[in-house]
């Protein structure tokens, strides 16, 4: 079933509203979209942060978003999440959507389970929360306080909080950026498992080219407010850094980002 799309008409300036209201939320024969952006523009003062973006993400597709700091990646996430409505253009996003940020953003005065189920209603909410925590490897930690969690555990709670809502669109804004290397590897495996199980469309923001290739079906590069590259990840699974196809794609992405292999290796 195609995900229900939210028409973010309130985000659009008057010249685009009629077009958005008439838009078909499920274009294509028998298919659908989790995200459809056309001509998206975001300006802060005199600074153009996003300049005419077009982006489509299909149900179940995992898209990694790369770009230098300040290129507009987090701004795009905020817009798709409904946190920023000062935009021009057409923005359609799945109604059921969740966001995970680099910081877990847990409420310190609530225990783990209430953090996971925050804002949900229904008699089965607590059980759904426990199931979500078990899925991320935190069964039995329902009554723990956020302050007692490691960085990796806190991000697991954030993932549980996102997935308990069964989103059609899961957005992750550098969720593993503050974690150590070993914890990141474990979180990669967990995310892959959860995505196979729940099958949301994913928009994954990262600075790590290897991480993007390891996880994504497709990689897009944002450069000065525009998409400068959009490529499929044509690397056989299980993906290995030693695979020549992995190395070629890495070189392509690093070149697009203006970083050579030597600089990346010594970073």
Swiss-Prot record:
Keywords: ATP-binding, Cell membrane, Membrane, Nucleotide-binding, Translocase, Transport
Protein topology in the membrane: Peripheral membrane protein
Family (UniProt): Belongs to the ABC transporter superfamily. Aliphatic sulfonates importer (TC 3.A.1.17.2) family.
Single GO MF descriptor: ATP hydrolysis activity
E.C. code: 7.6.2.14
Domain of life: Bacteria
Subunit structure: The complex is composed of two ATP-binding proteins (SsuB), two transmembrane proteins (SsuC) and a solute-binding protein (SsuA).
Gene3D superfamilies for this protein: P-loop containing nucleotide triphosphate hydrolases
Any Pfam family: ABC_tran
Function, in words: Part of the ABC transporter complex SsuABC involved in aliphatic sulfonates import. Responsible for energy coupling to the transport system.
Organism: Frankia alni (strain DSM 45986 / CECT 9034 / ACN14a)
Name this protein carries in UniProt: Aliphatic sulfonates import ATP-binding protein SsuB 1
Keyword Membrane (UniProt): yes
Cell compartments where the protein resides: Cell membrane
Gene that encodes it: ssuB1
Binding locations of ATP: 67-74
Residues in ABC transporter domain copies: 35-249
Main location: membrane
Cellular component, GO annotation: plasma membrane
Catalytic activity: ATP + H2O + aliphatic sulfonate-[sulfonate-binding protein]Side 1 = ADP + phosphate + aliphatic sulfonateSide 2 + [sulfonate-binding protein]Side 1
């Amino acid at each position: 079933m195609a995900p229900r799309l939210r028409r973010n008409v309130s985000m659009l300036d008057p010249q685009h509203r009629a077009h958005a209201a008439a838009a078909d939320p499920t274009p294509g024969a028998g298919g659908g979209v989790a995200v459809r952006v056309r001509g998206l523009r975001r300006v802060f003062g005199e600074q153009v942060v996003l300049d005419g973006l077009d982006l489509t993400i299909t149900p179940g597709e995992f898209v990694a978003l790369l770009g230098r700091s300040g290129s507009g990646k987090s701004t795009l996430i905020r817009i798709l999440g409904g946190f920023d409505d000062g935009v021009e253009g057409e923005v359609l996003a799945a109604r059921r959507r969740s966001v995970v940020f680099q910081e877990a953003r847990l409420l310190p005065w609530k225990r783990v389970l209430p953090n996971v189920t925050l804002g949900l209603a229904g008699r089965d909410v607590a059980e759904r929360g426990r199931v979500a925590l078990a899925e991320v490897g935190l069964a039995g930690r329902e009554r723990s306080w956020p302050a007692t969690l490691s960085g990796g555990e806190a991000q697991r709670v954030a993932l549980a909080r996102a997935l308990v809502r069964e989103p059609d669109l899961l957005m992750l804004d550098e969720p593993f950026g503050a974690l150590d290397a070993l914890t990141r590897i474990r979180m990669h495996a967990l995310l892959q498992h959860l995505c196979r199980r729940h099958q949301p469309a994913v928009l994954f923001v990262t600075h790590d080219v290897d991480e993007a290739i390891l996880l994504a079906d497709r990689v897009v590069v944002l450069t000065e407010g525009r998409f400068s590259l959009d490529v499929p990840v044509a690397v056989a699974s299980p993906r290995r850094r030693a695979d020549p196809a992995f190395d070629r794609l890495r070189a392509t992405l690093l070149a697009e980002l203006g970083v050579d292999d030597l600089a990346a290796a010594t970073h």
